[in-house]
Amino acid sequence: MSRSKRLQTGQLRARFAAGLSAMYAAEVPAYGTLVEVCAQVNSDYLTRHRRAERLGSLQRVTAERHGAIRVGNPAELAAVADLFAAFGMLPVGYYDLRTAESPIPVVSTAFRPIDANELAHNPFRVFTSMLAIEDRRYFDADLRTRVQTFLARRQLFDPALLAQARAIAADGGCDADDAPAFVAAAVAAFALSREPVEKSWYDELSRVSAVAADIAGVGSTHINHLTPRVLDIDDLYRRMTERGITMIDTIQGPPRTDGPDVLLRQTSFRALAEPRMFRDEDGTVTPGILRVRFGEVEARGVALTPRGRERYEAAMAAADPAAVWATHFPSTDAEMAAQGLAYYRGGDPSAPIVYEDFLPASAAGIFRSNLDRDSQTGDGPDDAGYNVDWLAGAIGRHIHDPYALYDALAQEERR
């Protein structure tokens, strides 16, 4: 008897990303429009720009997605880590959105591939946020206890699914015959639940933060947004607006310049009013709407070194970053490489290393642009103790340093 064909974790990841994209397009039709317009923009950009694929092949860019999910506590985050490991996605970076200009009561990491070949094959990544319930500025003792009790009662993932994920991660893949059911179950775990929402509990959490309500006010998690990659985000923004899609007011991240694109630029269409059922305190179930899910799009540039990141932060602190950009950054890749501001494979200015991660200010800005009001923060110090070491210990996994990963890629010779 011949042995069944095996699929590696990277192949499973490609199927997982495609499955989530298909599901989200069915749930949020405007996302399908976004993907369609991205494809048109990318095709047109490729015909106009000789070096359009300098930061990734069109095949990679077209397939590229990042997702965002939210969980409530370390146990749930650890379960997410176990599931994503089966797709070759490891935790990279630490983001504290409580420190943003518009604070959000979450701390986050991103699960993604870290190997260059895996990134080239399929770079799917998921920005994963955990509710910061230990922060007394948002949650007093009584509310914290009730949130903890609520989270302890729910189960985000079938234990059998997690057991299978751990086995696949340990083996580096699975038999092809087992893959469809596993991927389908993993995708289904992030579908929007149709269970009625307890209205009084959801409303109470909403007074703290709409994000807190989205995390701990419902019995499951879901894809909050999926994000295709586009080569010209300004053109994308214009085309979406022309189609009558309401976009947020700005493009988050660095300004458009004549020099090399750096880091990450993001925008989105506004969160849509989606019908949900609500359960009142007397048990009555009535229809209502929630605005929690939206469609984001991103354009990625070259990864900056710590020195380059310092200059970026200085430029973005200006009232008009575009006006001062040239005082912080040169206009060519050769100068960027010579000054040690960005990462290039083997030091070759013609081989930029794409930024694979996120910007906390942009993430918080996107979240805030799709909320009706700011989070309510109380007075007092931040004594919750959240940091990258705490998060790594809480989930029992090493959280990779993005700069160390870029340094390693930069040591490789150009292919």
UniProtKB/Swiss-Prot annotation:
Naturally occurring in which organism (per UniProt): Mycobacterium bovis (strain ATCC BAA-935 / AF2122/97)
Site (Important for substrate specificity): R70
UniProt xrefs under Pfam families: HGLS
Function field: Catalyzes the decarboxylation and hydroxylation of 2-oxoadipate (2OA) to form D-2-hydroxyglutarate (D-2-HGA).
Enzyme class, UniProt record, top EC level: oxidoreductase
Gene3D superfamilies: Uncharacterised protein PF07063, DUF1338 (3.10.180.80)
EC number of this enzyme: 1.13.11.93
PANTHER family assigned: 2-OXOADIPATE DIOXYGENASE_DECARBOXYLASE, PTHR39479
Cofactor(s) needed: Fe(2+)
Reactions catalysed, as given in the entry: 2-oxoadipate + O2 = (R)-2-hydroxyglutarate + CO2
UniProt GO MF annotations: dioxygenase activity; metal ion binding
Keywords, in A-Z order: Dioxygenase, Iron, Metal-binding, Oxidoreductase
Residues annotated to bind 2-oxoadipate: H66, R70, H225, A361
Positions of Fe(2+) binding: H66, H225, E296
The protein's name: 2-oxoadipate dioxygenase/decarboxylase
Similarity field: Belongs to the 2-oxoadipate dioxygenase/decarboxylase family.
